């Protein structure tokens, strides 16, 4: 709920200006000071988007200020249309149309991985909130956003079930469930945890690597079932990656699957990358000769033809493309929007989708191998499972 100051005729213009600037910029008072009721430079007392000028306040429903919030949305994000319109001026654009000029006067942008939310897009704009309807967020320059007071959110776990189904469908297609094997899972978060459950249900042995979780479980005395990645590689018949793509920090994942790791693998091990392009060093993969299932590629959409021919199964970054996953992502986007702008946007209709389903992954692979130059078009045309 927003609080709008009442005012005398004498001060109305001044207070209106303060309010308008506050509602769009959320005055730059640090979180540390915000909840202490400190004054911003405009002499406005406030706490997390609520505002007090003088002693009198009246309640203002956010809909009354809907004209002040402009939102740019990737037109290919499903299930959002109609949800934000009561609260904002909404423009739906093709990914190629989301540019610095089109977002300049927007307060919020809602994108997918095709749009890079960086200085080139955001510099000089009014954008204060960036939302991506995806698990991955390496297309967002988070450092730039932090430095410029722009809040951002991704949708962790939204399509975890779909990616798990993708991995299971690939293993089924390759006939690997015919006997008991060992699967190594690198990254045991939303997706990796589901893959672990699936493999156990199939009767496979499971070994896992996740340094961040291992560190946490050690600190909380939960024991430690995690192994070093080299130890996982030495025993696994299948290694599947489910990490974000990171370049810095204690455990960067760029080219995590490199020549050294591949040398530690069994010669007949299968490598699966349905996480992010760049986690697997594709040149090293070719040199090693290991079989691979690849959904996420380096240099998308201009993928390597040689790697494409080498892959046992090759798809166009659609592992998480399920109706359920997209619906969950849109729900999460609305939740973030509501928290930021103090609105009450809801999904237009409630829908139910299957939680688990295998699919014909081979036909998708054949389509890409037959026309790799149409990577992006095939991805856009892919029918949600």
Where are these regions (language model features)?
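Glycine-rich adenosine-cofactor-binding loop
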Residues: 181-200
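NAD(P)-binding Rossmann-fold cofactor-contacting core
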Residues: 202-219
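N-terminal amphipathic/hydrophobic targeting modules at extreme N-termini
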Residues: 13-25, 47-48, 57
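Rossmann-like adenosine-cofactor binding region
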Residues: 117-118, 215-305
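N-terminal glycine-/charge-rich "phosphate-binding" loop or analogous flexible N-terminal tail
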Residues: 61-106, 207
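Phosphate/diphosphate ligand-binding glycine-rich loop within oxidoreductases
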Residues: 74, 108-178
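Short, positively charged and aromatic/hydrophobic N-terminal segments
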Residues: 29, 45-48, 52-59, 63
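Rossmann-like dinucleotide-binding domain for NAD(H)/NADP(H)
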Residues: 268, 274-385
